[in-house]
């Protein structure tokens, strides 16, 4: 079992409880190594130290740690130090990916995003560090998983939000299952992901996304991502799947 966290509320007690309950891996977000760069996007009020402590706490409790990082104009020069820190603390996987024009990122995109040259330079640097690091270092493409959906007709991961809703993707405001109403076992047995990808709303969304710039919080006909409740097609998908026996 794995989870993602900003790390700010992690304590020894929380890590111990999560480990006992079966947590194997946690991915923390580390968007800078100075209070200035971190809070330029996180607005945590000087709580970067809590994130750094969370990484150490998780490792002390035998939990595998991955780190995700958002490159932006204030932290671009910190990546050698960020990677040094992660290697020193035993982080197993480090992933950076370009800023996406979603949520606050959309409203502040011009102030935060790197130039194409900066993105290319950082990608090359990460590749070079990966070649000599025991830690897996990747430059991520947030569009890749949507290509995989279209090619395979399956959704190979489960995206659960704070409301117990499963979505097609963290970047699309479409709920395909609700754990408050039905079990995860039913979701798997009924192969709901297959029906979700065939649904016309989902199909139209996936068809229009070819590159990073195609993402937006305000797609026509959809709720504003992170600000309005998702479109919920979960009951419709469940009804269809039960009629067809999940195939």
What are these regions (language model features)?
Residues 1-98:
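Radical SAM/AdoMet-radical enzyme domain recognition
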Residues 44-48, 113-116, 178-182:
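Short, conserved loop/turn and helix-capping segments at secondary-structure boundaries
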Residues 171-247:
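Flexible mid-to-C-terminal extensions adjoining Fe-S/redox cofactors in radical SAM and related proteins
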Residues 95, 168-170:
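Beta-strand scaffold of nucleotide-dependent catalytic cores
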Residues 64, 76-78, 102-168, 210-217:
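A C-terminal junction/extension of Radical SAM enzymes
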Residues 9, 33, 72, 100-101, ...:
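Short, solvent-exposed loop/turn segments at secondary-structure junctions
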Residues 1, 137-139, 176:
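Generic structural signal for residues in well-ordered beta-strands
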Residues 56-65, 83-88, 117-132, 148-159, ...:
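A short, terminal or domain-edge coil/loop segment
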């Amino acid at each position: 079992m794995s989870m993602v966290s900003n790390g700010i509320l992690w304590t020894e007690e929380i890590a111990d409880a999560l480990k006992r309950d079966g947590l194997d891996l946690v991915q923390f977000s580390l968007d800078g190594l100075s209070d200035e760069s971190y809070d330029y996007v996180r607005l945590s009020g000087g709580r970067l130290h809590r994130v750094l402590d969370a990484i150490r706490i998780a490792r002390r409790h035998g939990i595998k740690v991955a780190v995700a990082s958002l490159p932006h104009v204030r932290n671009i020069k910190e990546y050698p130090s960020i990677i040094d820190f992660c290697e020193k603390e035993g982080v197993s996987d480090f992933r950076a990916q370009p800023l996406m024009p979603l949520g606050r990122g959309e409203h502040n995109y011009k102030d935060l995003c790197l130039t194409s040259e900066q993105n290319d330079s950082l990608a090359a640097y990460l590749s070079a560090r990966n070649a000599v690091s025991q830690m897996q270092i990747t430059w991520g493409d947030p569009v890749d998983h949507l290509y995989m959906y279209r090619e395979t007709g399956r959704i190979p991961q489960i995206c659960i939000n704070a409301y117990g809703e499963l979505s097609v993707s963290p970047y699309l405001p479409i709920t395909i299952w609700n754990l408050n109403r039905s079990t995860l076992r039913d979701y798997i047995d009924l192969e709901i992901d297959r029906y979700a990808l065939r649904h016309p709303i989902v199909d139209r969304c996936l068809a229009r996304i070819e590159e990073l710039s195609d993402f937006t919080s305000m797609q026509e006909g959809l709720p504003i991502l992170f600000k309005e409740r998702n479109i919920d097609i979960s009951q419709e998908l469940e009804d269809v799947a039960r009629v067809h026996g999940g195939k």
